[in-house]
């Protein structure tokens, strides 16, 4: 392999990297280097690059280890010099941590090992040097536990079992009658080390390595391997993080939070990650190591006094008891707190964003182990962006870029109905780890959560604590409840990042995985029982509580105003009812981009008349039935035009094949026979005659209108009749009539003539006319290829990207699920093309159609109305190819508006 620099060192206020090198050094490595340079105390160490991770998978472990060995040895020597100790030396040992660090934050998804370098001789030497054997053997048993899990694969044998190491610890504590790990004696800790080693040998067949250099290479390679573990792959898929980015490996001198009562470890945030409030907050544990906080093994205490008081109030603990038993760091370690507060402020000012920081206090000295832009809820994301804008730390364009479009979805999630909540039975309280309202059936294991979710059930996952292996279950659940863990535990951090409701550290619950029960204050709930969680307050309720729409904040409105200021691309909505139209208008939709007329026919009184029209064999019979349908259609359009007064409403003429409307069951056919005064056999024969081998490519869209022009005429009268009536009332309707599934100019011309002839007749009858446009959906590849011809008649194009994707790929939307998972797994496809617009294929047809159409009609309006209209990357593509608008479901409107603004900001850059 070509010799490239693979190892970058940092320490003593110097670093070979900086914050701009996150692609190469990963987020953690780049920030460790940057913190060194700006005077934040960071233990020395080195970073192995993300490119090395990719080469690890390309050329194999042996080749990478051989190439890295000299550079790693030199970096270890540099770290030894900084710490005045020696790696593997029994009398003056250097211990290190080995951590992952991708360029995008992936909390808990990859592996970490602490206290590396310990063996029996080093432990004895370190005990003699420090005079603190309890700290040494506590660190040693932690190291064996982590290494056994991460490197040697020591896992629970089945999902009902707890961690095998924890099982041994619990057994030892039970014999002694103690509850906390820190109460274990030195002899018990030594015994745990030996029992852990024996358990590893028995379960894995591997001896625990005693050579520190062998330990180091085992850990480095394990971190590289963890890039491709199941949970990391799933997380990358959820967060759209490319596999080819790879992870860096950070090797850093250990500092110890478990050296006694003047030592501690913690995680803190420069602002509240749940609400966005400008309030420094976090959690710490005295005499502990960092993984204790993140893993949720012990429920920690608050860093700030105000945070501690809020926690005590929620937990029902008096101020006197709180101050005595659960003091904040601000009270218990005031000097350390003052330094921590000063440095967190410095880091936020430097990075100009909310920071998530990890730190350790070793015998009264503060060290920072990492900083990163913190994961946050959708609510916090918007508030923090607006607050930083007001504080002058960022400008308007940066505020727009700081917000992730898909996370706006969280702000629109329902909350518990206030009246129902007032009468609900609260059964316990925990920490409000991630806001929102969640209700579902209890499950205890991640695979069960996935299975129940796939069966259409809503579930709440209840765990003692979550681990990264639970990620898929957390994604499937409505919410998460844990017995252990704080506001910075794995469950809390991941839930906030996913926008999932979470209540953590509910100490009043007892979870029994084998019995599949949870006992809460004397109440026993079983798997399948309903439970409700309020992640904003930490309250847990028995049973189901109904929800209602959330109220949107002033910060949200301000962000939407910024989006309007910078966007060129407009956002409409897909809406078939006045209610949907009003919701979308509230979110800022400038019109309706797709109103589907067929959805209006499925109400009981309408479907009979519709079926009568379809099942009639003569034009006279169809027209008679259409006369019954006309007032229903007109009434529907009156409501929608009224809701969208002054805004364009694009109505698609009847599109689906007729067989979708007719009764296929015996009872339905008997009902129609009675209504039409014909035999059941006649109805059955007519229904059978409508069945097609490939209905999506059959008698539908404009083909229906051209074979049954009376349908188009009726719909035109309903649309324009409603517009005329509202104009007489003084309103300002803007109807647009869209011909679906056009592939040939003559198909469109034929339908346009019916529409315009019907309009002229209607306007003459009413003595009033309204302006309207006639356009077409571009959803057949031939229409895109001949768009210049179609644009000679069509006044606008609306790209139906669902069907255009279907016909371009030759994939059936209804059947793609049979092979899509395999295609995604094998990377034949990177994403589902029905979810994310295929820019290289379908996108080029759109680009071509826009260019061809505007070559003959420069003022041609173009938009899209498929599901892609609310997907951020697709919206940005639509901006780049010059579309005028996108249209999406009402609750995706804010997401599309933000994506459109970001596209405009990115274009200027």
Indicate residue ranges for each PLM-predicted region.
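Conserved alpha/beta-domain cores
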Residues: 99-100, 552, 562-909
């Amino acid at each position: 392999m070509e010799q490239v620099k693979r190892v970058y060192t940092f320490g003593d206020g110097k670093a070979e990297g900086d914050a701009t090198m996150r692609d190469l050094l990963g987020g953690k490595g780049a920030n460790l280097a940057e913190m060194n340079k700006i005077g934040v105390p960071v233990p020395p160490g080195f970073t192995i690059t993300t490119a090395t991770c990719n080469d690890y998978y390309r050329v194999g472990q042996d080749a990478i280890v051989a190439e890295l060995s000299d550079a790693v040895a030199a970096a270890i020597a540099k770290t030894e010099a900084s710490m005045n100790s020696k790696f593997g030396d029994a009398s003056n040992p250097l211990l290190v941590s080995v951590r992952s660090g991708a360029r995008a934050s992936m909390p808990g998804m990859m592996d970490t090992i602490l206290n590396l370098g310990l063996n029996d001789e080093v432990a004895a030497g370190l005990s003699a040097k420090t005079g603190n054997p309890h700290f040494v053997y506590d660190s040693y048993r932690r190291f064996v536990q982590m290494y056994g899990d991460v490197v040697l694969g020591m896992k629970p044998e089945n999902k009902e079992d707890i961690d095998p190491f924890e099982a041994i610890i619990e057994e030892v504590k039970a014999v002694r009658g103690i509850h906390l790990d820190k109460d274990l004696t030195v002899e018990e800790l030594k015994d745990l080390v030996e029992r852990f080693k024996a358990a590893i040998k028995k379960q894995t067949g591997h001896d625990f390595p005693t050579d520190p250099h062998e330990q180091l290479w085992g850990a480095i390679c394990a971190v590289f391997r963890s890039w491709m573990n199941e949970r990391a792959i799933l997380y990358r898929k959820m967060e759209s993080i490319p596999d080819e980015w790879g992870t860096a490996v950070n090797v850093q001198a250990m500092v110890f939070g478990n050296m006694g009562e003047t030592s501690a470890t913690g995680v803190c945030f420069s602002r509240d990650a749940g609400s966005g409030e400008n309030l420094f907050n976090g959690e710490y544990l005295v005499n502990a190591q960092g993984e204790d906080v993140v893993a949720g093994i012990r429920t920690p205490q608050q860093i700030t006094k105000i945070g501690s008081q809020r926690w005590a109030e929620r937990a029902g603990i008096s101020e006197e008891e709180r101050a005595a038993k659960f003091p904040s760091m601000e009270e218990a370690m005031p000097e350390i707190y003052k330094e921590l507060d000063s440095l967190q402020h410095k880091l936020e000012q430097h990075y100009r964003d909310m920071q998530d920081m990890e730190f350790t206090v070793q015998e009264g000295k503060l060290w920072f182990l990492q900083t990163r832009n913190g994961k946050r809820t959708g609510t916090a994301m918007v508030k923090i962006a607006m607050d930083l804008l007001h504080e002058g730390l960022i400008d308007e364009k940066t505020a727009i870029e700081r917000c992730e479009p898909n996370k706006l979805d969280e702000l629109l999630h329902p909350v518990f109905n206030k009246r129902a909540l007032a009468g609900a039975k609260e059964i316990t309280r925990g920490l409000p780890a991630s806001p929102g309202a969640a209700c579902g059936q209890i499950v205890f294991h991640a695979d069960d959560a996935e299975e129940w979710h796939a069966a259409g059930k809503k579930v709440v996952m209840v765990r003692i604590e979550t681990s990264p292996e639970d990620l898929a279950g957390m994604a499937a659940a409505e919410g998460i409840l844990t017995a252990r863990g704080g506001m910075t535990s794995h469950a809390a951090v991941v839930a906030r990042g996913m926008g999932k409701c979470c209540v953590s550290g509910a100490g009043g619950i007892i979870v029994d995985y084998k019995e599949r029960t949870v006992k809460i204050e004397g109440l026993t709930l079983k798997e399948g029982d309903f439970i409700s969680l309020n992640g904003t307050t930490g309250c847990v309720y028995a049973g189901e509580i109904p929800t209602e729409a959330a109220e949107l904040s002033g910060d949200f409105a301000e962000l939407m105003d910024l989006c309007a200021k910078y966007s060129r691309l407009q956002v409409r909505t897909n809406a078939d009812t006045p209610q949907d139209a009003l919701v979308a208008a509230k979110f800022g939709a400038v019109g309706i981009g797709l109103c589907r007329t067929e959805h209006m026919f499925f109400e009981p009184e309408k479907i009979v008349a519709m079926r009568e029209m379809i099942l009639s064999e003569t034009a006279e019979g169809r027209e008679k039935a259409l006369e019954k349908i006309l007032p229903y259609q007109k009434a529907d359009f009156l409501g929608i035009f009224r809701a969208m007064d002054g805004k364009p409403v694009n109505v698609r003429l009847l599109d689906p094949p007729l067989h979708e409307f007719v009764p296929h069951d015996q009872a339905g056919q008997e009902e129609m026979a009675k209504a039409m005064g014909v035999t059941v056999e006649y109805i059955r024969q007519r229904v059978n005659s409508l069945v097609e081998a490939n209905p999506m490519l059959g008698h539908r869209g404009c083909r229906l209108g051209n074979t049954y022009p009376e349908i188009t005429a009726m719909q035109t009268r309903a649309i324009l009749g409603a517009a005329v009536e509202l104009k007489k009332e003084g309103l300002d309707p803007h109807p647009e009539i869209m011909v679906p599934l056009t592939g040939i100019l003559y198909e469109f011309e034929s339908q346009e003539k019916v529409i315009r002839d019907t309009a002229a007749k209607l306007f003459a009858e009413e003595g009033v006319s309204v302006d309207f446009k006639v356009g077409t959906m571009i959803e057949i590849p031939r229409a895109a290829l001949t768009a210049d011809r179609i644009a000679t008649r069509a006044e606008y194009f609306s790209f139906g990207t669902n069907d255009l994707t279907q016909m371009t790929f030759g994939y059936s939307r209804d059947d793609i699920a049979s092979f899509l998972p395999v295609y995604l797994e094998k990377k034949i496809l990177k994403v589902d093309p029905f979810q994310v617009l295929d820019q290289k294929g379908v996108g080029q047809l759109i680009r071509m159609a826009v260019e061809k159409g505007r070559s003959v009609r420069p003022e041609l309006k173009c938009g899209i109305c498929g599901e892609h209209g609310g997907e951020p990357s697709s919206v940005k593509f639509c901006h780049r190819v010059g579309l005028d608008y996108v249209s999406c479901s009402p609750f995706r409107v804010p997401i599309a508006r933000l994506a459109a603004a970001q596209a405009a900001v990115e274009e200027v850059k």
